[in-house]
Amino acid sequence: MVNDMKIGFIGAGNMASAIVGGAVKSGKFASNDIYVCDINEEKVNKLKTELGVNAAADALELINSVDTVVLAVKPNVFASLLPSVSKNINNKGTFVISIAAGKSVAEINNLLGSNVPVARVMPNINATVLEAMSAYCCNALVNDEQKALVEKLCSSFGKVVSIEEEKFSIFSAIAGCSPAYAYMFIDSLARAGVKNGLAKGQALEIAAQTVLGSAKKILESNEHPWELVDRVCSPGGTTIEGVCALQENGFEATVTSAVDASYLKDKSL
């Protein structure tokens, strides 16, 4: 059963720490069912102290203690790490979840063996505030219970969707890269506020909260974004002037170009 599974994280960096924090703080996973190891003992001890998770001395000890392993190390570590633990993973029939960017399910299976159930998960930076948008895909060996585990884990630090692996590049261009675009937009709003007399800190709070509320409105409404735009724009009013200025300066085309550029770069890697 999903609730009985023990999960181990190889790697305790920022993303892994955010995921572990979400898993425990959401109440969806018990801290004593989670194991963590990292070459940086300080990071592991911090998670152990703050969240009550188990510390493993190394990857092999961790694998022998859990049912599911989350690979949360840098992609360039895979070539040396995975062959060194493949025997233990195969012997136990361990379910492997990777959150490493740019490593396909096939590449992971090539390093671990073709009989290993593997899921690939792509969270975004907003996992650190438990508002991530994640996507996942699996090989044919992943069963329904394991898929449910992936969704339960990812939903503990945000929202999650299942997509085909070939769509990961466009998902990355939107969910992975757009936080940076959103930060730029929010900062631009704030700087415009400063230009017109607001203090920077106050302007930033106003801009960020407004964007947060607008995003929430879209998620909680069945209305198309342009319907919401029309509702805010009064005839001859201030908002329609700003909307027209954005259109005249290529706002929509610029956003599309940014996504296209990120998508093409991801495909070329």
Residue ranges and their predicted role:
Residues 1-64, 131-132, 194-196:
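NAD(P)+-binding Rossmann beta1-loop-alpha1 motif at the extreme N-terminus of oxidoreductases
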Residues 119, 168-173, 225-230:
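Short pre-catalytic strand/loop immediately N-terminal to key active-site residues, enriched for Gly-Thr
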Residues 51, 59-136:
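Rossmann-like NAD(P)(H) cofactor-binding subdomain of soluble oxidoreductases
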